[in-house]
A protein has these predicted regions:
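Short, solvent-exposed loop/beta-turn-alpha elements that line the ligand-binding surface or hinge
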Residues: 11-26, 31-62, 104-128, 142-146, ...
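A generic secondary-structure signal for well-formed alpha-helical elements
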Residues: 3-4, 12, 35-37, 75-89, ...
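Structural recognition of the beta-strand scaffold that forms the well-ordered cores
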Residues: 20, 29-34, 71-74, 82-83, ...
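Bilobed periplasmic-binding protein-like "clamshell/Venus-flytrap" ligand-binding domains
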Residues: 82-86, 136-158, 259-310
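Solvent-exposed loop/turn segments at secondary-structure junctions
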Residues: 2-6, 25-28, 37-40, 78-82, ...
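Periplasmic binding protein-like
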Residues: 1, 6, 10-20, 176-241, ...
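A local structural motif
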Residues: 147-152, 173-192, 268, 274
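Append "and occasionally in soluble cytosolic enzymes with long acidic Gly/Pro-rich linkers
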Residues: 43-46, 50, 58-179, 258, ...
């Protein structure tokens, strides 16, 4: 934990044992919304949905509003959350894309994050813009019959060091922006189980808003779509349930169009197998479309934790993707 870092570094008997773990450059963290807040039976999985106390009907109206999602996109300051786990400096960990930089490059050596429409995506944090989208969302959601403040259930795993602190500073920062002048949202931090967290919370759809990560399995941008892409009728990887929300009629109108356009963009990109540059540009366009329509919100690279060890981690087995680096 960062709480004891200073004391260990100041102690001559322990300072030489402290180091940061090797950076995981194939992973990225992001925020995502639950587009399926109700129970659903898949052929190979069931979701329980959001508990009634968090008003899933009200949430369904809110998440269907692009103005609501964009209010979050522009209200979130990643630096606040990153400062919890990166007290020595966080600028190198901030991301404005889902795919990390230096993940792969096209035939001309152009980094994937600089390909296609992704090259135009920049940091979004802007309080004034966030409040403009909030005001538009208030008008839109009031007409749709929503009530305020919108409850936003935000769970964390107590077994993960500092995740609870990240949630607390996130709540303070985002509510400080979005509730300035109007009681817009109530971010409700909930503690999930330390064991079986994924099955009990994320894969069960028992949340409304969440932060989590995805790790690349191989060095091609197709691997980065799977938290969000779903084939028709399939559960996918049980992150945001974008397509299922549309198929169940929860997500409608403009947002449904965004979701299905993204699915189509991914399918067309996957079909490009002979032209690497065209393939990368197509995937980059799809990722940019996902972000700019606030279907996901980028956060950061993983901040390597400080550990006490006598091993030289740089002498161990390494690969930027997959599980190879877990072998000592």
């Amino acid at each position: 934990s960062s709480d004891i870092l200073d004391s260990w570094l100041a102690d001559d008997t322990t300072k030489d044992m402290v180091s940061m773990e090797r950076p995981e450059t194939g992973k990225s963290y992001f925020y995502f919304f639950n587009f399926l807040p109700y129970a659903h039976q898949f052929p190979n999985w069931n979701t329980t949905g959001v508990d009634a106390q968090y008003q899933p009907d009200n949430w369904a109206k809110a998440v269907n509003s692009t103005n609501f999602r964009k209010a979050f996109l522009y209200a979130i300051n990643p630096a606040v959350t990153l400062a919890v786990t990166a007290p020595e400096g966080y600028e190198n960990y901030k991301l404005h894309t889902i795919t990390p930089p230096s993940f792969c490059a096209n035939s001309k050596g152009v980094d994937y994050t600089e390909c296609g429409a992704l090259a135009k995506v920049t940091d979004h944090f802007n309080e004034a813009t966030a409040k403009q989208y909030r005001d538009a969302a208030v008008q839109e959601l009031t007409a749709a019959g929503a009530t305020f403040p919108i409850k936003v259930q935000y769970p964390y795993n107590p077994a993960v060091v500092d995740w609870d602190k990240q949630c607390q500073v996130f709540k303070q920062q985002v509510e400080g922006v979005l509730n300035d002048g109007f009681d817009f949202v109530e971010i409700i931090i909930t503690q999930g189980p330390s064991d079986n967290f994924l099955n009990a919370v994320r894969r069960a759809g028992a949340y409304e808003f969440m932060s989590y990560y995805w790790g690349a399995d191989y060095s091609d941008p197709e691997t980065e779509v799977y938290p969000f892409y779903q084939e028709a009728g399939d559960r996918g990887t049980c992150y945001a349930f974008l397509r299922t929300g549309v198929e169940d009629g929860i997500i409608t109108g403009e947002t449904a169009d965004y979701v299905m356009t993204y699915m189509d963009m991914v399918e067309k990109a996957k079909a490009i197998t002979a032209d690497l540059d065209a393939r990368y540009a197509a995937f980059a366009d799809a990722e940019a479309y996902l972000i700019e329509n606030a279907l996901v919100i980028p956060l950061s690279l993983p901040v390597p934790p400080y550990i006490a060890t006598r091993l030289n981690l740089w002498e161990g087995q390494y690969a930027p993707t997959g599980f190879s680096s877990n072998r000592l």
